């Protein structure tokens, strides 16, 4: 298909705004009636999403697909790295986990990964009119340039034009842009179409002399300056978002384990006006919570040991003695059980450790992951049956022992199965379902069970949609997009 030229967005640093800029450009093009798809050759993240065909990609690419108004697909993020130690990560290729590699092992593997990356890019080119590509980190990382598949290595191999974005809010924006360009090869410099400055606050007339200097020194145009957009409630790709517009009275505490995954599960709580969501870090206590939720984890056994080292297991026991409620999601659910077994060494050395012992389940880690989008019903004590939707990403298989109550009924392709566990007293609930709080009925049932009565869920889809449209409007107003797609946009002043 490929009617319009693809574009790659690279950044001078991590968190320069690449993910949001790609999402915004996808929405701008979609609003023009263009069939557009996002693409990220290589992503490193613990927040992942499940595609309809049972593959796994970065959640950022799923968000960008939403912005493009298309369904997420494994080819949108062919290489996903999910760190499970400080020097190692699980490598996922076109949606499927292949093995865990250390940093040096992956450096060697990259030359083998490029064909998969180019195959996925070709698939998107064949099925969409335009592809907007996101780089990773910075293209100027000298130590990572050999066999690069994430930035200029891909752009050169696929012959894709590039724009470079920098975050002026961090300071040093001209050094970042000038220095990044200077560290590229001549052929790489030639494919850079221009610069974008992101997150600007203040009087732009004060910035103009610097923009003119940059254009003169580099010979590259500044395509525009995007203002700082306050209150954008989009999922965070890496760092946990903790800011709240307003804090409620009902305190929910989440212990931050070392390999916390899919912390976007808690965005519905963080943004709710009745809830004070607190992420509890090293050396802090879980005491004072109305509700405790154990999050997902990429290294469940190691994080369970860390949880104990912080004394959080004792905080949980005390919380339960005083009538509090506890919930576990995915890895947190496994921790609440009786045993955790890793006979194949999926997370390191083969091992068997005791869980917290609050739920009548035992979990064994398997090589094959469960990757599924699910819908069903949630049945909690003293609550009406609630619709539930979510997704499963886990290697563990949990076996229910005597006395386990199964609170989630999943209807999948005419097959009824069960998920989760509830203790005999009805005070502890565990589930494998990520995204469970994003379904309003499930949110209201869980929070009512936990003690927050008659509180209505917020509409996360509407919040995300509003944020994406704000970004798209700002991009279209701020950038001279005619320099990227002249047949679609009229020329305008960039600043």
UniProtKB/Swiss-Prot annotation:
Known pathway: Cofactor biosynthesis; adenosylcobalamin biosynthesis
Sequence intervals crossing the membrane: none
Family annotation (CDD domains): CobQ_N (cd05389), GATase1_CobQ (cd01750)
Keywords: Cobalamin biosynthesis, Glutamine amidotransferase
Residue ranges occupied by any GATase cobBQ-type domain in the UniProt entry: 249-442
A molecular-function term among this protein's GO annotations: ABC-type vitamin B12 transporter activity
GO biological process annotation, one example: cobalamin biosynthetic process
Signal peptide range in chain numbering: none
Gene3D superfamilies given in the database record: 3.40.50.880, P-loop containing nucleotide triphosphate hydrolases
Tree of life domain: Bacteria
Active site residues of this protein: 330, 434
Pfam families listed in its UniProt record: CbiA, GATase_3
InterPro entries: Class_I_gatase-like, CobQ/CobB/MinD/ParA_Nub-bd_dom, CobQ_GATase1, CobQ_N, CobQ_synth, GATase_3, P-loop_NTPase
Protein family according to the UniProt entry: Belongs to the CobB/CobQ family. CobQ subfamily.
Function: Catalyzes amidations at positions B, D, E, and G on adenosylcobyrinic A,C-diamide. NH(2) groups are provided by glutamine, and one molecule of ATP is hydrogenolyzed for each amidation.
Record-given protein name: Cobyric acid synthase
Species whose genome carries this gene: Aliivibrio salmonicida (strain LFI1238)
């Amino acid at each position: 298909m490929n009617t319009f030229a693809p574009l790659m967005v690279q950044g001078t640093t991590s968190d320069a705004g690449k993910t949001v800029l790609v999402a915004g450009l996808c929405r701008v093009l979609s609003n023009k009636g263009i069939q557009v798809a996002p693409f990220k050759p290589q992503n490193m993240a613990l927040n992942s999403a499940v595609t309809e065909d049972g593959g796994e990609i970065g959640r950022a690419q799923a968000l960008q697909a939403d912005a493009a108004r298309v369904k997420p697909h494994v080819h949108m993020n062919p290489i996903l790295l999910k760190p499970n130690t400080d020097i190692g990560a699980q490598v996922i290729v076109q949606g499927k986990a292949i093995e865990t590699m250390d940093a040096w092992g992956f450096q060697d593997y990259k030359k083998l990964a490029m064909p998969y990356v180019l195959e996925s890019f070709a698939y998107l080119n064949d099925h969409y009119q335009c592809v907007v590509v996101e780089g990773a980190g910075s293209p100027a990382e000298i130590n990572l340039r050999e066999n690069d598949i994430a930035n200029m290595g891909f752009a050169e191999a696929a012959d894709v034009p590039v724009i470079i974005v920098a975050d002026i809010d961090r300071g040093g924006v001209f050094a970042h842009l000038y220095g990044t360009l200077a560290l590229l090869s001549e052929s790489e410099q030639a494919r850079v179409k221009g610069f974008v400055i992101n997150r600007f606050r203040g009087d732009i007339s004060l910035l103009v002399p610097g923009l003119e200097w940059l254009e003169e020194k580099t010979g590259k145009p500044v395509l525009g300056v995007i203002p700082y957009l306050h209150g954008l409630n989009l999922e965070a790709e890496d760092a946990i978002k903790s800011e709240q517009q307003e804090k409620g009275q009902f305190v929910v505490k989440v212990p931050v384990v070392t390999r916390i995954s899919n912390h976007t599960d808690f965005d519905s709580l963080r943004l709710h006006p009745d809830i004070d969501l607190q992420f509890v870090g090293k050396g802090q206590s879980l005491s004072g919570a109305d509700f405790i939720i154990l999050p997902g984890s990429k290294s469940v056994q190691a994080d369970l040991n860390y949880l104990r080292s912080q004394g959080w297991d004792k905080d949980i026991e005390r919380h339960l003695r005083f009538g509090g409620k506890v919930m576990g999601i995915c890895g947190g659910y496994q921790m609440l059980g009786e045993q955790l077994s890793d006979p194949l060494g999926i997370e390191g050395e083969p091992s068997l450790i005791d869980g917290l012992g609050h739920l009548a389940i035992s979990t064994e880690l398997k090589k094959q992951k469960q990757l599924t989008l699910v819908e069903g019903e949630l049945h909690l004590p003293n609550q009406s049956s609630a619709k539930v939707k979510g997704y499963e990403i886990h290697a563990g298989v949990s076996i229910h022992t005597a006395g386990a109550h199964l609170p989630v009924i999943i209807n999948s392709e005419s097959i009824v199965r069960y998920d989760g566990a509830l203790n005999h007293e009805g005070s502890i609930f565990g589930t494998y379902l990520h995204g469970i709080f994003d379904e309003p009925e499930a949110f209201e049932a869980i929070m009512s069970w936990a003690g927050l009565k008659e509180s209505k869920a917020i509409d996360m889809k509407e919040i995300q949609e509003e944020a994406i449209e704000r970004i798209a409007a700002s991009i279209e107003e701020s950038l001279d997009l005619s320099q990227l797609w002249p047949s679609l946009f009229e020329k305008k002043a960039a600043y």
